[in-house]
From Swiss-Prot:
Matches recorded under SUPFAM superfamilies: Actin-like ATPase domain (SSF53067)
Protein name per Swiss-Prot or TrEMBL: Anhydro-N-acetylmuramic acid kinase
Gene name for this UniProt entry: anmK
Gene3D superfamilies xref list: 3.30.420.40
UniProt KW Membrane keyword: no
Family: Belongs to the anhydro-N-acetylmuramic acid kinase family.
HAMAP family per the UniProt record, alphabetical: AnhMurNAc_kinase
Catalysed reaction equations from the record: 1,6-anhydro-N-acetyl-beta-muramate + ATP + H2O = N-acetyl-D-muramate 6-phosphate + ADP + H(+)
Pathway this chain belongs to: Amino-sugar metabolism; 1,6-anhydro-N-acetylmuramate degradation; Cell wall biogenesis; peptidoglycan recycling
One of the GO biological process terms: 1,6-anhydro-N-acetyl-beta-muramic acid catabolic process
This protein's UniProt keywords: ATP-binding, Carbohydrate metabolism, Kinase, Nucleotide-binding, Transferase
Length: 371
């Protein structure tokens, strides 16, 4: 198949108020060209709506009928993300007729990993049929449900794209990709077609929630609070005893599985330092689970903008962190690019989840296509 232009959309569980939207040219196996990338801010009313939706989702917890707010939020975010796609494409001098497919991840409102004797559950809000009717192009969406129904974790799905990036950079098994979003996830490849991916632990979500709870903004900007604080080593050691961290992969997390309450009772600075150290230390424990411990981590996602977390990856995880830009990648765009890449795989009928990533029995296709 010849490479086609595809748009990818991602809004993370950290709820930073932005739509990540990226355009790439790909055949679903290699990246032929990187197009533009943008952060399109949600209107404040949609951001507040999504915060309330996530709160109601936690109360619902997959029991009984879905909250009515889901339908309202789904339509609002679908229309807003459709507008973001159109603006990016037309700003690049293309029309929607030039776009082969849009990868619409939607907004994860709740994710529950499978347990012995029970399948997992996952819910992403996003109306692919509505987006198709607005944009007039094919839309791949609902990427995770089929994997979960087949007994998989439903996450992480970025491994196929991360592996393509590593292959294009010519790295070996001493380098892995770490994405620091609301949750942290890692992808490792041996360079010969075998790869592993899983969620390592929390990243930005508990830290951001902790900062917000003190009325000090949306995040620990530039890692300043964490840098000024002192890690509570006793508390950190206790947190690192959590069974998830030593459990074998495949494994996945919801953004609320590790919460801001981990820092209860600490000053803002010490809490930020301790939560940052926990993120980095959890990555270190994850590296110990891999077939070979990498020496370098290429870091994407919002967390790489936090110098405190980046330096703690070196001191607490025993690895050299490298910003994605050092490889010529766009660290804020990787997840949106990923869903453009996966959309082309959905279009081509190629697998998007694998035994080494989500734990499904065999490589499997996923996603639905509105056309």
């Amino acid at each position: 198949m010849e490479p086609i232009w595809a748009v990818g959309l991602m809004t993370g569980t950290v709820l930073d108020g932005n739509i990540d939207v990226a355009l790439i040219k790909t055949d679903g196996e290699r990246i032929a060209e990187f197009g533009p990338y943008a952060l399109a801010p949600y209107p404040d009313w949609i951001r507040r709506l999504l915060e309330e939706t996530l709160a109601q989702a936690r109360v619902w917890n997959f029991n009984g009928p879905e909250p009515a707010i889901f339908k309202e939020a789904e339509e609002a975010l679908t229309r807003a993300q459709s507008a973001a796609v159109k603006e990016l494409v037309e700003g690049f001098g293309l029309t929607m007729a030039d776009i082969g497919v849009v990868g619409f991840h939607g907004q994860t409102v709740l994710h529950r990993a499978p347990q012995k004797g029970r399948l997992g559950d996952t819910r992403q809000l996003g109306d692919g049929e509505l987006m198709h009717s607005i944009l007039g192009t094919k839309v791949a969406y609902d990427f995770r449900s089929a994997d979960v129904r087949a007994g998989g974790q439903g996450a992480p799905l970025a491994a196929a794209y991360h592996t393509a990036l590593l292959r294009s950079a010519g790295t070996g098994d001493d380098t892995a990709i770490l994405n620091l979003g609301g949750v942290a996830n890692i992808t490792w490849s041996d360079g010969e077609g075998n790869f592993v991916a899983f969620d390592t632990g929390p990243a930005n979500a508990p830290l951001n929630d902790f900062i917000k709870s003190h009325g000090l903004g949306e995040m620990d900007r530039d890692g300043a609070l964490g840098r000024a604080g002192k890690v509570d080593e006793t508390r950190l050691a206790k947190l690192l005893e959590h069974p998830y961290l030593s459990a074998a992969y495949p494994k996945s997390l919801d953004r609320f599985d590790f919460g801001a309450s981990m820092a209860d009772g600490l000053s803002v600075e010490d809490g930020a330092a301790t939560l940052s150290a926990f993120t980095a230390s959890a990555v270190g424990k994850a590296l110990d689970l891999l077939p070979r411990r990498p020496k370098k981590l290429v870091v994407s996602g919002g967390g790489r903008h936090n110098p405190t977390i980046m330096s703690m990856l070196e001191t607490h995880a025993g690895v050299t962190p490298i910003g994605a830009e050092m490889f010529g990648w766009r660290g804020d765009a990787v997840e949106a690019e990923c869903f453009a890449f996966l959309a082309v795989r959905v279009l081509r009928g190629l697998p998007i989840s694998f035994p080494g990533t989500t734990g499904v029995p065999a490589p499997m296709r996923g996603g639905r296509l509105a056309e």
